[in-house]
Amino acid sequence: MAAKSQPNIPKAKSLDGVTNDRTASQGQWGRAWEVDWFSLASVIFLLLFAPFIVYYFIMACDQYSCALTGPVVDIVTGHARLSDIWAKTPPITRKAAQLYTLWVTFQVLLYTSLPDFCHKFLPGYVGGIQEGAVTPAGVVNKYQINGLQAWLLTHLLWFANAHLLSWFSPTIIFDNWIPLLWCANILGYAVSTFAMVKGYFFPTSARDCKFTGNFFYNYMMGIEFNPRIGKWFDFKLFFNGRPGIVAWTLINLSFAAKQRELHSHVTNAMVLVNVLQAIYVIDFFWNETWYLKTIDICHDHFGWYLGWGDCVWLPYLYTLQGLYLVYHPVQLSTPHAVGVLLLGLVGYYIFRVANHQKDLFRRTDGRCLIWGRKPKVIECSYTSADGQRHHSKLLVSGFWGVARHFNYVGDLMGSLAYCLACGGGHLLPYFYIIYMAILLTHRCLRDEHRCASKYGRDWERYTAAVPYRLLPGIF
């Protein structure tokens, strides 16, 4: 359910000649073949409670001014019943259904029908037709990278409407926020169910499918590795980036417009949240080609975790800071605002530079300079399913010599900055940093398990050279 996926441990060479042998791929690619009781319990818990968590947070803002304990206190003390809270919840509306259908259709058209032109005039930007990483079955998919273009065109239309056309109010997203939640849930469940049926009956690449024999695990974690319709519509790339992440900045802009409508001004806290989160969104689309080598594309299958998560969890819970500031227009002191800005920018610097170091190392096969020096590497090897031996390199210089996942530290610093922009009045806006800390720690451990299975003793040499996973001296 993450908006910003993270790269695997930096490697200089891709995986060639790989087949979908169960023994070789179980620890290296994709999700598990078999399900232990803890994983199954976790899956069932998320399927049951994740939709409720989203509803609870949004309802708490709508009915209790973002006080998370408000609904519980009212129910326990008898001041309200669950039926009372539900009765006050706005239902799905025709307007919301029309808006959401138009939105998703527009993003599908931008994704499938408009080849990228940004790479033709933006120096350093890599777009157009690009290859992804090799799959467990040895397939190398091609992708139409045009996310930055879609983001730019979408926001150009948004600002044209706000300042010239006046087709709709900039507050339209906030004004229909809960009715749109039901629409997003319908799409999330529909695409997840379709992906599961497709995996059973007409998969894009049957050799990349995984079945556990457990319905709930298959539904949540997915069966197909890269489900597609036609040549270019890739479920993973579309739903991870569009409609959720393109919408992220639009949602924040709508929240800012609502704050101005209600309070006659936009606070510096709202400006900070909009600017800092926009930096990460633009970075995501500027580096969309790099994203093809991240854990979401290279490891995760497409199921409810990605389908529903990207439609509902991401746009509704990653934007809680902006929503909170509509109800609580926090105006930060100058030192507080400067501190939040610096924390966010330093976090982004670490996040971007660490990923750039890894990408540069991979593209040049280690023939580069990192922090002005020739990079130190751990030479390693692994055997693929066809018995072929491959050689690779693990980077131990730059930020990757500080900790094995130091890019996550930058991500966490940025996440904390969003939350601190909201002051200390309520817990709700701090959900994001709590969630990201859990998510990135889990990803860190999952990636390390996969790399240990792949590289064996060479991985032990690497962990000896870089002893800390995330925080030097701590973890």
UniProtKB/Swiss-Prot annotation:
Its main location: endoplasmic reticulum. InterPro entries: ERG24_DHCR-like (IPR001171), Sterol_reductase_CS (IPR018083). It is found in: Endoplasmic reticulum membrane. It is a multi-pass membrane protein. Changing N274K: Loss of 7-dehydrocholesterol reductase activity. It catalyses: cholesterol + NADP(+) = 7-dehydrocholesterol + NADPH + H(+); 7-dehydrodesmosterol + NADPH + H(+) = desmosterol + NADP(+); 5,6alpha-epoxy-5alpha-cholestan-3beta-ol + H2O = 5alpha-cholestane-3beta,5,6beta-triol; 5,6beta-epoxy-5beta-cholestan-3beta-ol + H2O = 5alpha-cholestane-3beta,5,6beta-triol. The keyword Transmembrane applies. The modification Phosphoserine is found at S14. Its EC number is 1.3.1.21, 3.3.2.11. Belongs to the ERG4/ERG24 family. This is 7-dehydrocholesterol reductase.
